[in-house]
Amino acid sequence: MKNLYKILASSIAIFAFCACSQEEMPVNQSDNNQSEVVTRSATGIKNIVYIEVNDINPLNAGSYIMDDAPFFDYVILFAANIRGVGSDATLYNNPNVQYILDHKDTLIKPLQDKGIKVLLGLLGDHTGLGFANMNSAQTEQFATAVANAVSQYGLDGVDFDDEWAEYGRNGYPSGSTGSFSNLITALHNKMPNKTITAFNYGYAYELTNVNSYINYGIYAYFNSASWSTGFGMPNSKWAPYTINLNSAPSASSAQLYATQVANKGFGAIGYYDLRANNIVSVLNGVAKGAFKSTCTYDGNSYPKNY
């Protein structure tokens, strides 16, 4: 995802052109055929945040409150990796991710006790093997490793971000072998009651035939919106607006986009790179626009202590 952010930063002119063709700018009004949103539960919208756990303590996600409940519904620990090691597809946790998993009682369970679901983010790792170029044995091997990790560490599911695999390196095949959809199917079969989300990047477009196994899909371009869903997802399971909290828009812009998310019947809003500092202003903009509510900050900032 940092890769995507760098691409966007270095290609702003190209992005601006593309955004004009894809993006519908928000307007500060409700569609005439939409009923007024009055409560959080009435919208069903979920707030899904990616946290760069190499830098930030995930407990910071629990410091924002809306309607006497956590503002964020899902926290994605970003990220573990798929790593090709010879003929094996392995799950790799860097030291920061592994520490959090090993200390789940103090770094994961407090979020879950508040009602937040915690997912393990999955990302490529420059080895040439990724979600979209595995053979059947590797697909089964990786799905088993992921399902075992979810069970072992009491997680609520996983998220897929198809970046950094560098398909074709080290003798591995290029992408688009159909293994990404096979992986989703295998993982769903191993943990049918767990959550699966997917960032709409890389070969995620191949997931159309397994989108019934995916709880939410997340739009890949930060601080803008597209009202067309990816990989055939219904509006109710799509986050069309994703905010980069480390380079956040104004609260008023967030409010306008969030209003459209609610009025158009979308099911989620994405957030990337929550920091330890207070960012309640932009979250309050979302709360006003999508939920006709307010977001507050409880004042607790958690340092990275691992």
Residue ranges and their predicted role:
Residues 1-32:
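Bacterial Sec-dependent N-terminal signal peptides
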Residues 20-306:
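Secreted glycan hydrolases and related glycan-binding modules that recognize and/or cleave
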